Regions:
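N-terminally biased helix-coil "hinge/interface" segments that flank
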Residues: 1-217
Length: 217
């Protein structure tokens, strides 16, 4: 069977180029995502799940796995993070916050005002402009594993990454390159004794400080 991607169903709006590009991206990722969701749903049902499997879309909403338009799940992870941050902010009585999602090589930022977030109708992926509703999230090309280095007299961060292994210098896995995580540890923004992450022991502030002093200080 062929996977059919119809532009009028994927992006039912004016804009021939954007609509076509969105339909093409949907066709490119559609078969893989569709198969994955089918296998996942069947596995969950076999394990005893008695409810529908719902998938988050890039606009922060939910849709049944069987009705998912694959391309509309792009940036669904950051989107649901913003939705969760807005809920937590309201519960804490702080409706105006900046939500940040820091990954290994990128960081994503969204503004939440009065408990609500903004939406964007378009996004650019690999220079292709796609038309889809999505939570307005700004990406920055630096994450927790991004390595800091000096270019002449300028401090730069990224694009190289320490990755998960060996990871930042403070992990104690043999790396001596300073990362964003090392900087946050030295600045006491991270609790060395209680790091977030499965399997991580206590972090080493001295190793982080030595890496910074050696390479960028």
């Amino acid at each position: 069977d062929l996977f059919l991607s119809l532009s009028s169903a994927v992006a039912p709006e004016i804009g021939e180029y954007e609509r076509s590009a969105t339909a093409l991206f949907n066709a490119y990722v559609g078969r893989v995502i569709e198969g994955y969701l089918q296998r996942m749903e069947q596995t969950l049902f076999d394990a005893g799940l008695k409810h529908r499997v719902l998938i988050v879309q890039s606009n922060g909403g939910l849709v049944a796995a069987t009705q998912t338009i694959p391309v509309l799940t792009i940036e669904s992870g950051p989107a649901v993070g913003v939705v969760g941050a807005a809920y937590l902010a309201r519960e804490l009585g702080r409706p105006d916050v900046i939500a940040t999602d820091i990954g290994g090589t990128t960081s994503k930022v969204a503004v939440i005002e009065n408990g609500s977030w903004n939406y964007s109708r378009e996004t650019v992926i690999n220079q292709y402009q796609l038309r889809m509703p999505m939570v307005d999230v700004t990406s920055i090309g630096a994450g927790g594993g991004s390595i800091a280095w000096v270019d002449g007299f300028r401090l730069r961060v990224g694009p190289h990454s320490a990755a998960a292994d060996p990871g930042p210098a403070c992990y104690g896995n043999g790396s001596d390159r300073p990362t964003v995580t090392d900087a946050n540890l030295v600045l006491a923004r991270i609790n060395a004794a209680r790091p977030i992450g499965s399997g991580l022991g206590a972090l080493d502030p001295d190793a982080a400080r030595a890496a910074i002093q050696t390479h960028v200080a």
